[in-house]
């Protein structure tokens, strides 16, 4: 099945890319207040869709959307492995720590993307052959933009509060 992305932000029945970026980045910031992690999350927020790009045609053409690149299990395994490696087993040097935080954020961004797609349709479940998710709203619907707006407002409020109490990490 061929899916075409309506440039520059939507992809078939998935959430629009701009909203993936806003929601994922806001959640990452609200959870961590860690800039390298947040930058990684921003980059990872559209990665599952980008990995499906058909290389021979264009970066806007996709085959079999929401299949293997939207399976959350590999991302979760890598995220948990890196988190245990980095925080419990072997704390990294300053440079390695920066790379680690960006990578961990990127994996978080991929996981968030998949969770966000699960509210506008289905994604692979525990196996590639099972599907989970429910379409609570359609792509581009006012509800999608309302969720993004709420994330922006919460992030601004958090920035104001933490800006007074302590600097960002």
Predicted features by range, described:
Residues 1-169:
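N-terminal membrane-targeting hydrophobic helices
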């Amino acid at each position: 099945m061929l899916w075409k992305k309506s440039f520059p932000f939507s992809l078939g029945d998935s959430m629009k890319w701009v909203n993936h970026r806003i929601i994922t980045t806001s959640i990452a910031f609200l959870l961590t207040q860690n800039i390298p992690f947040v930058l990684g999350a921003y980059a990872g927020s559209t990665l599952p869709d980008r990995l499906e790009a058909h290389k021979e045609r264009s970066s806007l053409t996709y085959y079999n959307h929401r299949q293997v690149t939207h399976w959350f299990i590999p991302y979760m395994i890598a995220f948990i492995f890196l988190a245990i490696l980095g925080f419990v087993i072997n704390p990294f040097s300053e440079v390695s720590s920066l790379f680690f935080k960006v990578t961990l954020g990127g994996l978080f961004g991929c996981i968030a993307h998949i969770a966000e797609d699960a509210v506008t349709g289905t994604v692979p479940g525990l196996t590639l052959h099972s599907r989970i998710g429910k379409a609570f709203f359609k792509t581009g619907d006012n509800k999608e933009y309302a969720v993004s707006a709420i994330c922006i407002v919460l992030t601004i409020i958090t920035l104001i509060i933490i800006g007074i109490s302590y600097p960002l990490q």
